[in-house]
Amino acid sequence: MSLAIAVFAVIIGLVIGYVSISAKMKSSQEAAELMLLNAEQEATNLRGQAEREADLLVNEAKRESKSLKKEALLEAKEEARKYREEVDAEFKSERQELKQIESRLTERATSLDRKDDNLTSKEQTLEQKEQSISDRAKNLDAREEQLEEVERQKEAELERIGALSQAEARDIILAQTEENLTREIASRIREAEQEVKERSDKMAKDILVQAMQRIAGEYVAESTNSTVHLPDDTMKGRIIGREGRNIRTFESLTGVDVIIDDTPEVVTLSGFDPIRREIARMTMEMLLKDGRIHPARIEELVEKNRQEIDNKIREYGEAAAYEIGAPNLHPDLMKIMGRLQFRTSYGQNVLRHSIEVAKLAGIMASELGENAALARRAGFLHDIGKAIDHEVEGSHVEIGMELARKYKEPPVVVNTIASHHGDVEAESVIAVIVAAADALSAARPGARSESLESYIKRLHDLEEIANGFEGVQTSFALQAGREIRIMVNPGKIKDDKVTILAHKVRKKIENNLDYPGNIKVTVIRELRAVDYAK
């Protein structure tokens, strides 16, 4: 009984446990299903959010892609535009170059046509001359036959009359024939000489005309004054300085006369030496720009500009040598030639004159079949002696010959320099050509001025007289030659000798120069003591 009860109790417990477990399992299943639903909902939400974010990213990427594409397109267009501009510029440059080449070819073709025409004309002239000579030869042959016939007739006549022997008759006839032929030949020689002279004169004129037409001569009249513009008239007082110290220092150091008058905002620098005048002009302009105008600054700038002018002289010479096609000229000769930029001959700039002579000589030499490069070189150097003739004794021809020999120029160049004024005989065609080119350049209307050259020579002679006295360091002709200012060596000339020197200079000027009015002689003795504090 109790066992049954126990078994029943166990069964009841099992049933209850099963029911309890079933209820729990059902509850857990419902919870699981709920969680599954929640998870699915969350997944759906996350997927929607992800899809939205993905859409946003896609849209953003599309916008960025469009922006990048637009920028790339703009950059490509800009690159294309730049490339097109470069191509256009290159094409334009090439087209311009082609035009220049075409122009040069056209000019060369025209020149060749002219030469061809000249050669054709000369050939025709020679053919005519040859025909004329042939005709004359035939005439002479016919005349000779006639003379022989006359001889035979005379011989027969003489033999007929029997007064003379055959040998004597022959001698008489030969003498008469020789006399007749001599007159005929002399007449024909004179005619031929006259014809050759006329033709040679015409050819020479043609060559000179061609040379003159191909030279674009330029000429700027040389002056003895340079004008410097001032910012205002108050600068005139500063230029003069206290008690005239600045202007006296400026004139003493540069050798140029400073003219300050009523002309507004202008100072005039007057001097016959172009190098001194250029140094003075540069110094004055630098003083005005700098604003510091006092004797020490003036001295500093004058020395600086002297060095600058020396560099300019070399540049002028090199540029001129390259212009006439002589770049292999010795550097020292180039520098000496550069000094001619600041020299004049009868008012004509000597460097420009030398370049013009070189070009004319080259053209004429080319027309005559001579060495054009050598002719240009000889023409360029023919007046080189004028660059230093005021420093070295002798004429500019002698000095030029010495320079040419010193720097081993060809003998043709040396002889050209020596003979271009007819001092010695020309030994080559080039020497004659250069002499003709020199005369042609000098004779060109407006190229030279006798009055200016005479004035400059008078000032130069005035300075030479002063420099000839012992103890004189340098001298400057000022006031258009109305004053000579002499700087003496204080170690050689004492104070009591200054007045005597001025008197001697005055007497020599009176005895050796012709001049209008009076000339003031000023002798300056300046003693400087310089030391340095350390």
Curated annotation (Swiss-Prot):
<keyword id="KW-0378">Hydrolase</keyword>
<dbReference type="InterPro" id="IPR006674">
    <property type="entry name" value="HD_domain"/>
</dbReference>
<dbReference type="GO" id="GO:0005886">
    <property type="term" value="C:plasma membrane"/>
</dbReference>
<dbReference type="InterPro" id="IPR004088">
    <property type="entry name" value="KH_dom_type_1"/>
</dbReference>
<dbReference type="InterPro" id="IPR003607">
    <property type="entry name" value="HD/PDEase_dom"/>
</dbReference>
<dbReference type="Pfam" id="PF00013">
    <property type="entry name" value="KH_1"/>
</dbReference>
<comment type="function">
    <text>Endoribonuclease that initiates mRNA decay.</text>
</comment>
<keyword id="KW-0472">Membrane</keyword>
<keyword id="KW-1003">Cell membrane</keyword>
<dbReference type="GO" id="GO:0003723">
    <property type="term" value="F:RNA binding"/>
</dbReference>
<dbReference type="Pfam" id="PF01966">
    <property type="entry name" value="HD"/>
</dbReference>
<feature type="domain" description="KH">
    <location>
        <begin position="224"/>
        <end position="287"/>
    </location>
</feature>
<protein>
    <recommendedName>
        <fullName>Ribonuclease Y</fullName>
        <ecNumber>3.1.-.-</ecNumber>
    </recommendedName>
</protein>
<comment type="similarity">
    <text>Belongs to the RNase Y family.</text>
</comment>
<feature type="domain" description="HD">
    <location>
        <begin position="350"/>
        <end position="443"/>
    </location>
</feature>
<dbReference type="InterPro" id="IPR004087">
    <property type="entry name" value="KH_dom"/>
</dbReference>
<keyword id="KW-0812">Transmembrane</keyword>
<dbReference type="InterPro" id="IPR036612">
    <property type="entry name" value="KH_dom_type_1_sf"/>
</dbReference>
<keyword id="KW-1133">Transmembrane helix</keyword>
<keyword id="KW-0540">Nuclease</keyword>
<dbReference type="GO" id="GO:0004521">
    <property type="term" value="F:RNA endonuclease activity"/>
</dbReference>
<dbReference type="InterPro" id="IPR017705">
    <property type="entry name" value="Ribonuclease_Y"/>
</dbReference>
<feature type="region of interest" description="Disordered">
    <location>
        <begin position="109"/>
        <end position="141"/>
    </location>
</feature>
<feature type="transmembrane region" description="Helical">
    <location>
        <begin position="1"/>
        <end position="21"/>
    </location>
</feature>
<dbReference type="Pfam" id="PF12072">
    <property type="entry name" value="RNase_Y_N"/>
</dbReference>
<dbReference type="InterPro" id="IPR022711">
    <property type="entry name" value="RNase_Y_N"/>
</dbReference>
<dbReference type="GO" id="GO:0006402">
    <property type="term" value="P:mRNA catabolic process"/>
</dbReference>
<keyword id="KW-0255">Endonuclease</keyword>
<dbReference type="InterPro" id="IPR006675">
    <property type="entry name" value="HDIG_dom"/>
</dbReference>
<keyword id="KW-0694">RNA-binding</keyword>
